[in-house]
């Protein structure tokens, strides 16, 4: 009997591998991996299926990732886009503890491992959406996967042949999922309150004060329909910025939802709102008076105050409740919002509930952006050097509402002089960017992944609750770089850790705090991306005290939605060599080191944007020859940030030129996502179209149209900037590099301008808005500057240009990432969406929109196809099929899933071909 089963399984896998073109897989080793994982090795896919799996995985399949994919961006150039989506819940254990589900984000794949003692054996892989960041088990035969870039959730069935049964379209950039309710039959999914799949969304909501930007999609998992959205019970909007983490109470009756970048009750006053001089030093080291700039203030519970406690409350036109974590009644007929908790942290990563007492624990960082200046602090008396943000775990007691933040690095002497190092024994206690967390079964230990420290810390729960936590390196477990996902078995003796930088899963012996085995995952990323990633996150490398990194502000390569006053009073003015827009006045002859507040800019999409920083003070003039070619201006400019490792992060010395080159190679690959405000067919509404016409053609300034400065030439890679400097008008005293405009929709949420005569606007969800310092609350207020000459009626034309800018073109078209699952008898709305995907994929001018990939697993056989220009489908393994022939493969329970992937990536993804 067993021999017959083995032969049957071998035959199935032979068919699968023949159709799928074979390939590499996840290797097994006994030691932790380095930051760059070794080449993956083929899985032992022909070993017998464990009888204990019963009807599950009877026909394991290998669709993607560590099982069959072989090509990378090195062997198939230009076949990968690096989105740097942050993992949220990348691991899930099956309810019987026998399987581990792993999201392989760069491979767009769910990987299923059998737990065999202290090792992991790959038994199946299922192709899901783009950038899967979370997975949760709904039942023994079903898991749901959250696809961050596809704005979707893949419902994966495991009975018989693992396959995607449904694709649920949800809001923009979903991040987390849990199943709650007394029977755990309701799915809760966090996403941004925007996007073309969000019912009722229009760009008008982006200019409406007091509108929440966070959605929780709620489903009865047993009552899905075949519409695009799958018939959610409700979509609950939270009064916060976009959400990330979810957690459930021990009885399943409450779901906790956390805002991601929730802020910290800081805001910035416009320079025109300052009726007294700013406190502190106002000259450079060479004695030049600083330009007039704004001021960051923080609400202390009673008033808005600056660093010397001046009260600026009369200048702030709104309140910031700073609501971070929300409780949701998961059992109500229509789930409702309950208690809210403030003061949890600035950037909230993950949450877990203690199984012993029901307390909620939240990993977070607390930004210190109200502290002025970088550098030594000698002339300025203050500096954030080495202490940009505190890594914390915050304890919430639901019964009382008590919120107790616990700083994890209280052992560090942050007053050490610039260039000094702390003893190795002290540095080894540091933990940076805590993300995933999981409790021991008895609730006495909280295992916390320190993404920036390559460690998992076993924190005593009682010490966190009491606030008496004492850092102790003996409680740390060294793991591969970038730990971001944790799961623990029922007995509490084995911990499973997913590390994003190393792209590996390890099995940890909890008692000995040692790694027992390592499973390397396949990644299609280039060696340059894999090797350079650590320089963004690695706090041990980046800072002398091991607590901060570039990712402390540039969270997952993006931004933190805060402003910082990172001038350096110890420095002198420097000559501004940058090129200016023709006819623009040139008033900033020299860059002043006291630049004033500036909002964090994204690291995504930097190629082709010219000098860096808001002022362009990373000029890129010293361009080197690298690998036989003169580097780009942007590459040279990025390397000028090396000094920040010392002056800002607090490292003893800059990193080496080779390390900075590796960091640069990685950073230049980071990409912007599609704009979710734009219609999926890339069309414009009547208002957006009118705004585009004004933007491109009307002389809104004396220098010309908006496009004259903010150049929009998608075919040339220009999305709002031509890389030149310009005079900004009389209200701004410094000249600035013209910035790109692709992410304006992410900056909405502050209403109330400190420098106008308007009244108080009420509670808002964020304290920073538009312009270089975030002081302008809305684009409409930005366009009210006297430098702009809008045609009458000005209110209407400003509104039109605002609508267009919020729907601005991006590198990738709106359809990229979008999916639909089709089965015979599909509804009209499914057919319509599939027709849209096909039409967009066959649009080649003025530039290619996307590649359309089709995937199915039917009776144990994997089918993977790429749409051709003539409408036929190229099949993985060879041959062509007509559209009718491809659809003829699908059945009601074994459907086809179609995905629009970035142009140029389809051959690698669908066919494993360059």
Language-model region placement:
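Bacterial Sec-dependent N-terminal signal peptides
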Residues: 17-68
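Beta-strand-rich domains and repeat architectures in extracellular enzymes and scaffolds
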Residues: 76-111, 320, 432-441
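Short, conserved, GDST-rich strand-edge loop motifs in beta-rich repeat architectures
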Residues: 190-211, 258-319, 362-390
